[in-house]
């Protein structure tokens, strides 16, 4: 049957990508339907019970700055919070939280059920409705046809998923859920380039059978307790719990080696490539054969369960081997396994077949987000979901798509890497992937993106008001520090020596003093009995006050580095956003090698910047391409997506 209501956007899948996509589309005013095979698993944390980490936390902050749900849901469900790399520079500091799975799902579902313009429906999707070169809807497993002008696919590991435990395997999207076999077959009929990837998860352990007296305790940060959302408060956090640490040993490694003859990875049963930066324990033992021990973190799954997640022993070994290797570790000698670990193989589609908007190049109105694009991780999925949902909404509103640049957001780095370089293994985000990471910090994600999000229709009034107060206070206080001066006469020598190590010998602005190593904002403001502080409180909100002080201090201390990076960005931007015509035949570009013209014709980059990052496309080839465009009068700079792009975002043409 044809469902009587027609929608603007349909989102298929209710994981981290799908929920952010649906919320973003609905926030923009698009009439949105979220189709999921099971409403009870909306926002499910399928693998580890944690959010954030190096690079990943940056993405979560960016999703939050654009009005997304992941950070706020983590603040409401997080049972341990830590700042990683806290002793290092601000560019690589990252927030990580352990989450209560049940509370996290509840927080996400609450937002979905209370979001205007968003409808939920429980049915697996088996088919897409395609007319000519555009998608027009989706068909469920019982034949209900839903019509829409755009569809966002966020199928996770469900596309033709196959679960492996030892040499036993069966179809499934994850343990306990069916695979999307029919939908996978339909996508293959559309001739979209695809491949197989693999990921895995460890066995879960009953905490009542763990001997914690033998383990090392790892508490969260308590002074101060971190928050994830820019609007978050520590008071929102539920009860906090520690994690625990144990280690593998030589006996563990011998047990694993003895089971490799029954490992689906090492017997050729699994063909998909696994994640390099989250390897299985059997892969670790093989790749790092000289290492005598590996650290294993025992992470609580929640406040109302005894289940623990042993982070570091993802495995697809036979269950008897899993049982033996778990029992070989200190503190786990009598541990009871609640769920076996397993590997899962699934289909993904080559992201080079996508525009930077995450719309497929072959089928108008069809967007992909999450693991279907070859990424791994909740955070990478959520960021893509928000972008795909935003652009699906803009597509039906006949507006140009938007995507941040590499110098503007980790989301921009993620998407650019995917659509220009593709993936040979599951892609995860690291700070090392960003050329401009000094400017792309967790702490300034809102300063980089919230104004753009407001223009795009993603940011509500409450977030905008809080951001505006913060932005204005940072600007005022920075200018005050730059324009307030102290001299040897006005600053007592003993105060100067206590703060700076010696008395000053000429006039300095407070900003110049703050720029010195080891000098803090509070230290500068405390000079002259506090007279160097602001005349009026910056804010009466203690959390916002800390954010303002952090922004002011980092902005002043790193001003020179940030300005140099901005100059580099400006130089590189000269050709980065020069658009390439849709119909250009690269075989006609004089001087291009056959290999280069073939790659450019295959991947159809949208800009000179994207073309330059395709493997094998040399700087000389880019120069030839620029000459060709100039001669033909074809090249043009990107336009803008409303006023949002004028704030710095790149745009992608949307075909209607």
Swiss-Prot record:
PANTHER family, per the entry: GLUCOSE INHIBITED DIVISION PROTEIN A, PROTEIN MTO1 HOMOLOG, MITOCHONDRIAL
Family: Belongs to the MnmG family.
Designated gene of the protein: mnmG
InterPro entries to which the protein is assigned, alphabetical: FAD/NAD-bd_sf, GIDA_C_N, MnmG, MnmG-rel, MnmG-rel_CS, MnmG_C, MnmG_C_subdom, MnmG_C_subdom_sf
Binding site for NAD(+): 274-288
Cited function: NAD-binding protein involved in the addition of a carboxymethylaminomethyl (cmnm) group at the wobble position (U34) of certain tRNAs, forming tRNA-cmnm(5)s(2)U34.
GO-annotated cellular components: cytosol
Localization per record: Cytoplasm
Gene Ontology MF terms in the entry: flavin adenine dinucleotide binding
Description of how the protein assembles with itself and partners: Homodimer. Heterotetramer of two MnmE and two MnmG subunits.
Residue positions binding FAD: 13-18
Keywords noted in UniProt: Cytoplasm, FAD, Flavoprotein, NAD, tRNA processing
Species this chain originates from: Burkholderia cenocepacia (strain ATCC BAA-245 / DSM 16553 / LMG 16656 / NCTC 13227 / J2315 / CF5610) (Burkholderia cepacia (strain J2315))
Residue ranges, compositional bias (Gly residues): 647-656
Region of interest called Disordered, as start-end residue ranges on this chain: 637-656
Cofactor: FAD
Pfam families referenced in this protein's UniProt entry, alphabetically: GIDA, GIDA_C_1st, SAM_GIDA_C
Highest taxon listed in the record's lineage: Bacteria
This protein's name: tRNA uridine 5-carboxymethylaminomethyl modification enzyme MnmG
Main subcellular localisation: cytoplasm
Single biological process term from Gene Ontology: tRNA methylation
Disulphide linkage map: none
């Amino acid at each position: 049957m044809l469902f009587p209501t027609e929608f603007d956007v349909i989102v298929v899948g209710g994981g981290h990508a799908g929920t952010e996509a649906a919320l973003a589309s609905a926030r923009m005013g698009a009439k949105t339907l979220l189709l999921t095979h099971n409403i009870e698993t909306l926002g499910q944390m399928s693998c580890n019970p944690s959010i954030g980490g190096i690079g990943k936390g940056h993405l979560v902050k960016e999703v939050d700055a654009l009005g997304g749900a992941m950070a706020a849901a983590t603040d409401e469900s997080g049972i341990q919070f830590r700042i990683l790399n806290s002793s290092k520079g601000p560019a690589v500091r990252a927030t990580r939280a352990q989450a209560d799975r049940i509370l996290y799902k509840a927080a996400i579902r609450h937002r979905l059920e209370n979001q205007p313009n968003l409808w939920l429906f429980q049915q697996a999707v088996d088919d897409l409705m395609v007319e000519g070169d555009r998608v027009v809807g989706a068909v469920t497993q019982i034949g209900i046809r839903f019509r829409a002008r755009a569809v966002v696919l966020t199928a996770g590991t469900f596309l033709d998923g196959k679960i492996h435990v030892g040499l036993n395997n069966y179809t499934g999207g994850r343990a306990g859920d069916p695979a999307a076999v029919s939908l996978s077959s339909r996508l293959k009929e559309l001739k979209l380039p695809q491949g197989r990837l693999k990921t895995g998860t460890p066995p879960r352990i009953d905490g009542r059978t763990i001997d914690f007296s033998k383990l090392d305790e790892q508490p969260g940060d308590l002074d101060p307790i971190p928050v994830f959302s820019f609007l978050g408060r520590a008071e929102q956090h539920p009860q906090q719990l520690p994690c625990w640490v144990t280690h593998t040993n030589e006996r563990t490694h011998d047990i694993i080696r003895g089971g490799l003859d029954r490992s689906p990875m090492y017997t050729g049963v699994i063909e998909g490539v696994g994640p390099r930066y989250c390897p299985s324990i059997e892969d670790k033992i093989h790749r790092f054969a000289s290492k005598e021990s590996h650290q294993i973190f025992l992470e609580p799954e929640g406040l109302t369960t005894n289940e623990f997640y042993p982070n570091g022993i993802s495995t697809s070994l036979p269950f008897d081997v899993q049982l033996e290797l778990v029992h070989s570790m200190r503190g786990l000698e009598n541990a009871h396994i609640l769920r076996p670990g397993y590997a899962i193989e699934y289909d993904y589609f080559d992201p080079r077949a996508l525009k930077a908007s995450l719309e497929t190049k072959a089928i108008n109105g069809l967007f992909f987000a999450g693991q279907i694009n070859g990424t791994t991780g909740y955070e990478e999925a959520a960021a893509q979901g928000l972008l795909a949902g935003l652009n699906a909404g803009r597509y039906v509103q006949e507006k140009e798509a938007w995507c941040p640049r590499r110098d503007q957001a980790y989301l921009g780095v993620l998407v650019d890497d995917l659509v220009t370089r593709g993936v040979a293994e599951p892609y995860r985000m690291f700070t090392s992937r960003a050329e401009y990471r000094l400017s792309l910090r967790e702490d300034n994600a809102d300063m980089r993106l919230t104004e753009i999000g407001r223009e795009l229709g993603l940011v509500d009034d409450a977030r905008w008001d809080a951001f505006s107060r913060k932005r204005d206070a940072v600007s005022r206080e920075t200018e005050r520090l730059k324009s307030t001066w102290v001299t040897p006469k006005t600053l007592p020598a003993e105060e100067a020596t206590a703060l700076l190590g010696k008395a000053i010998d000429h006039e300095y602005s407070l900003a110049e003093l703050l720029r010195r190593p080891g000098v803090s904002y509070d230290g500068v403001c405390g000079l002259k009995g506090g007279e160097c502080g602001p005349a009026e409180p910056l804010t009466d909100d203690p959390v916002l006050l800390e954010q303002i002080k952090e922004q002011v201090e980092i902005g002043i201390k790193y001003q020179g580095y940030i300005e140099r990076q901005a100059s580099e960005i400006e130089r590189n931007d000269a050709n980065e956003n020069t658009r390439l015509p849709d119909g250009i035949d690269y075989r006609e570009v004089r001087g291009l090698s056959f290999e280069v013209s073939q790659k450019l014709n295959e991947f159809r980059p949208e800009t000179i910047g994207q073309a330059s990052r395709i493997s094998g496309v040399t700087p000389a080839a880019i120069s030839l391409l620029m000459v060709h465009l100039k001669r033909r009068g074809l090249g043009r700079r990107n336009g803008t997506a409303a006023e949002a792009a004028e704030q710095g975002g790149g745009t992608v043409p949307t075909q209607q």
